A protein has these predicted regions:
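Extracytoplasmic "Venus flytrap"
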Residues: 31-39, 47-66, 277
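Mature extracytoplasmic/periplasmic domains
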Residues: 272-273, 277-338
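Extracytoplasmic ligand-binding site segments that recognize negatively charged/polar headgroups
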Residues: 53-69, 80-94, 98-237
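Short, low-complexity disordered leader/linker segments with a strong preference
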Residues: 1-49, 360
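A ligand-binding cleft/hinge motif common to bilobed small-molecule-binding domains
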Residues: 110-114, 239-260
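An extracytoplasmic/periplasmic, membrane-proximal ligand-sensing/linker region
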Residues: 41, 48-49, 312-360
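Sec/Tat-exported extracytoplasmic proteins
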Residues: 50, 75, 97, 174, ...
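Short beta-strand->loop
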Residues: 121-130, 141-145, 168, 256-273, ...
Length: 360
């Protein structure tokens, strides 16, 4: 659910414009000013609330289960989640503002500014704020990226003899590439954008990527099926382009379900964009202190390490991962030429163009 991107983002862009110009009714209750409250008070009030209700933060995404269990065990907060796309999360925040049920969400990087435009989020700066890169947070604290994904490749070595660690290597192989739903999938669109950079283009020049995929298509080397675990387990996919943490999760799942398959994970060395997911607190959150405490925990050393246990790389570079965990992840050496996507507007335009041109 978290991978759908452009079609719903376009809807939200229109929606946010309408909301800003319309004279809407006042919400049932004003939001708390979390920026003026001490951490001790937030923890005390959160324990009194006793509940945290999230959207788009499921157990099986970036070790969400481990994080929620720790939050529950540490602070006594009961948790429930409704999984949905980033656009749906923000739409729910707005549609429920008079009778809110959700406290916090996790949205794709490009949706952070959209959330502000829609005026459905409230600020909070965790105590680790200064260790978070400036590009990865709203200056006022209305969204904060908590973990990163980098474009990688999951390679079925039973099907592919070559080492696929770059778009050039893929092009020169006989392997088929699985991209998933390029019309609506964030990871799929980021794969195309990564290829553009690798082939000499960028977010404002996508032609090299489309030339690349046209050539692969002419050779019958684009697999139009999805990148599901079921297909991976059956050995139907040669190379799946997706976020690094998903390649590692899928590798582990396939190893358990079909030990005869040998899966290899790499970062695309000639073009690998890097993006993240933003924590956002509902402006109308029924449990605002619990939401702030959740943000605080997820950006703490413990919370960042737990994200890494789901193979998502922490946003905070000052967090030291345990050696046994680092050994399971893709080597740091493969991340030397990654491309952070700091300009959200440019990325949004690029994704819109990718979806439009891919359909052609």
């Amino acid at each position: 659910m978290k991978k759908k991107f452009v079609s719903t983002l376009l809807v939200l862009s229109v929606m946010s414009t309408c909301l800003l110009s319309a004279c809407g009714s006042k919400p049932a209750s004003e939001s708390v000013d979390l920026t003026s409250v001490s951490l001790d008070t937030i923890e005390e009030k959160a324990k009194e609330e006793g509940t945290i209700s999230s959207v788009g933060m499921p157990d099986d995404w970036a070790n969400g289960k481990g994080s929620w269990e720790s939050i529950s065990n540490t602070y006594g907060l009961a948790h429930d989640d409704t999984d949905m796309t980033s656009a749906e999360e923000l739409s729910m925040f707005d549609s429920e503002k008079d009778s809110p049920t959700k406290d916090i969400g996790d949205v794709g990087q490009a949706f952070g500014p959209t959330a502000i435009d829609m005026d459905v989020v409230q600020p909070y700066k965790a105590s680790t704020w200064d260790s978070i890169p400036d590009w990865a947070k709203d200056p006022d604290g209305k969204w904060t990226i908590s973990y990163l994904g980098t474009m990688g490749a999951l390679v079925n070595k039973n099907n592919v003899s070559e080492t696929i660690d770059s778009w050039e290597a893929l092009k020169n192989s006989s392997a088929k590439i699985t991209l998933g739903d390029v019309l609506r999938g964030a990871s799929s669109q980021m794969a195309v954008l990564s290829c553009a950079y690798a082939m000499g283009g960028d977010a404002e020049n996508l032609d090299p990527a489309f030339d690349y995929f046209k050539e692969l298509a002419s050779e019958g080397r684009i697999d139009v099926g999805d990148g599901s675990v079921e297909r991976l387990n059956r050995g139907e996919i040669d190379v799946l382009a997706t976020w690094d943490y998903l390649t590692l999760q899928y590798r582990d799942i396939v190893a358990e379900n079909n030990p005869d398959l040998n899966m290899e994970c790499h970062i695309m060395q000639d073009g690998a964009v890097q993006s993240g997911y933003c924590l956002v607190i509902n402006k109308y959150a029924p449990h605002p202190y619990s939401a702030a405490l959740t943000v605080e925990y997820l950006l703490s050393d413990e919370g960042q390490i737990e994200r890494a246990e789901g193979y998502a790389r922490p946003i905070r570079e000052d967090v030291t991962l345990p050696d046994d965990l680092k050994a399971k992840m893709i080597s740091d050496d493969e991340y030397t030429n990654t491309i952070p996507l700091a300009d959200n507007d440019t990325v949004t335009k690029a994704c819109t163009e990718i979806a439009s041109r891919w359909e052609e």
